[in-house]
């Protein structure tokens, strides 16, 4: 990453967990403008892989969260669930999918977002433990860092993974190499936000934005039926009070992490 840029400058990020369905989008739209004002947020990063009915990203839902304040949208294993994604993902510079899909996948696994005098790199990878088969996320991040580290002042990584152990391993693997590593996918915010020994901010999972009384956003009765019958069940999004999960990352003038705090709003 680049060296310190002269002049006083503190950069604040709002990094938001998986937004689930219509209620998630409405909750995102409700809280993000308020938080941007309250915390003087400069850049909003959000995982959007569940914004279209809980599965995937549509053109309409992507535009909606951009209008609500998202600057960069990451994703995960549900990125392809809406067929229309392939018609526009290559035209969206700040919508990224896991970089460790095999060569030839539409879209990109990282982006560089310019903000004032800074270039912000964001990398998205998927874990492999209890997840669909993918290329190695550790090797893929190394490959991307070689390509972009000299272009970027700040680098954020979203590891979309099931296993906390894999996310923690990625955090320590990248400690001192990137600014921040956040986990997504499990939809439950973890209480382990910290600054690692070499200065990288880390949290195992950001949590989700969407229905609170649910099984990861899904109607709990659907989930119970699935577990009891071991047969396919049509999942529907839950309704009721919502939860909003995110972190605020504050960087000092030299791009080091000044603070890394969780945000959790429960409307129940």
Give residue spans per PLM region.
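Acidic, metal/ion-coordinating pockets
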Residues: 2-268
């Amino acid at each position: 990453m680049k060296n310190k840029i002269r002049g006083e400058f503190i950069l604040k990020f709002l990094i938001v967990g998986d937004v689930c369905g219509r209620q998630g989008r409405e909750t995102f739209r409700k809280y993000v403008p308020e938080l941007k004002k309250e915390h003087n947020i400069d850049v909003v990063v959000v995982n959007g892989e569940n914004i279209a009915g809980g599965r995937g990203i549509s053109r309409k839902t992507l535009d909606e969260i951009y209008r609500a304040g998202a600057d960069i949208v990451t994703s995960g294993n549900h990125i392809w669930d809406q067929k229309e994604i392939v018609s526009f993902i290559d035209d969206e510079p700040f919508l990224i999918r896991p970089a460790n899909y095999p060569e030839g996948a539409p879209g990109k696994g990282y982006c560089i977002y310019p903000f004032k005098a800074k270039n912000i790199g964001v990398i998205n990878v998927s874990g492999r433990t209890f997840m669909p088969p993918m290329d190695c996320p550790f090797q893929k991040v190394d490959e991307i860092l070689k390509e972009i580290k000299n272009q970027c002042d700040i680098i954020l990584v979203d590891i979309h993974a099931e296993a906390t152990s894999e996310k923690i391993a990625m955090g320590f693997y990248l400690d001192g190499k990137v600014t921040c590593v956040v986990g997504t996918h499990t939809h439950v915010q973890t209480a382990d936000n910290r600054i690692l020994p070499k200065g990288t901010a880390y949290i195992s999972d950001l949590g989700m934005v969407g229905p609170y009384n649910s099984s990861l956003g899904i109607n709990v009765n659907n989930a119970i039926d699935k577990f009891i019958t071991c047969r396919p069940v049509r999942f529907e999004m839950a309704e009721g009070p919502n939860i909003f999960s995110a972190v605020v990352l504050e960087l000092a003038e030299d791009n080091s992490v000044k603070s890394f705090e969780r945000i959790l709003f429960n409307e129940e």
